[in-house]
Regions:
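A short acidic, leucine-rich amphipathic alpha-helix
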Residues: 50-52
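Short, locally clustered residues in the helix-turn-helix/winged-helix DNA-binding domain
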Residues: 8, 36-43, 103
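Short alpha-helical "packing" element that flanks the helix-turn-helix/winged-helix DNA-binding module
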Residues: 31-35
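C-terminal regulatory/oligomerization modules of transcriptional regulators
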Residues: 119-148
Length: 148
């Protein structure tokens, strides 16, 4: 019980400053993650399946998040150039501008000091990844081709 209670409280402590920082940008952390992932690619585009694998979340969650981003004009869905079954996500100029501003704010306000040194933070990420994997939350992503 101590583990569950401690992890739950740590999650609350880590998420609260992220949510409050993203609120003025009308972004949830899930929406931010999708935008940030797309902005990191060479041309701002990535197949939906690749995005899902890299985010390590359930495909339904990514679809729901992308639906809202498309509705708000921050992401476009495009046809895959070679696979008629696949969808490509593309960040819009508005999405790129928003995620850059949100990233600056997060780096300054929420991520600057989480209370752990770099080694402890890396250890914690590895431990949590093992827990999530054993619980079936994600599998190691397959080797993926470079995004378009």
């Amino acid at each position: 019980m101590v583990l569950v209670t401690s992890v739950n409280r740590a999650q609350q402590l880590l998420v609260a400053p992220v949510e409050s920082t993203l609120r003025p940008f009308a972004l949830s952390f899930a929406r931010f993650e999708v935008l940030r992932l797309l902005a990191f690619t060479r041309d701002g585009r990535m197949p939906m399946g690749s995005a899902t694998a890299r985010l390590q979340v359930h495909p339904t969650s990514v679809t729901s998040t992308v639906d809202r981003l498309v509705r708000d004009g921050l992401v476009r869905r495009e046809k895959h150039p070679t696979d008629g079954r696949a969808t490509v996500l593309a960040i819009t100029d508005a999405g790129r501008e928003l995620v850059e501003r949100a990233t600056e704010a997060l780096n300054a306000q929420a991520f600057a000091d989480v209370g752990l040194d770099e080694a402890d933070a890396a250890d914690l990420v590895r431990i949590i990844a093992r827990l999530r994997k054993r619980a079936g939350d994600f599998e190691d992503p397959p080797e993926l081709p470079e995004p378009l």
